């Protein structure tokens, strides 16, 4: 029997639309397991939030990849049917540099698929057509509302 304790998420070249062969990322299936192993979730809040978003996307039936645009990482490329959505995850967009990092990589992707930044900020500050949502709102949204694939 196989125990699925972690999910392997392959990397994907956003520009070339090709899978990359190395450096997959791994996400735990149960956040409680990570805590039980002694990891400090408060110190690793960015990783915890990424993990939550990854598992939520999988539970919604999405195929999930980690994207690369040049030397910059796109946290998730989520696909379901013909629909694609790019997602960046950040703890807080507390300063200009963080906002630029999270929105900037999405702004550099030259297609019209929906792009979203998910954070714990209580107020949404989308820009240039990129949606910004609080993680609670992301988790509560209708999983089929914006997927037309």
Q: Residues of each region from the PLM?
A:
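Hydrophobic/aromatic beta-strand patches that form the interior of the parallel beta-sheet core
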Residues: 27, 87, 116-118, 131-133
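Hydrophobic, well-ordered secondary-structure elements that form the walls
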Residues: 57, 75, 87, 106, ...
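Cofactor-binding loop segments of dinucleotide-utilizing enzymes, especially the Rossmann-like FAD-
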Residues: 69, 91, 120
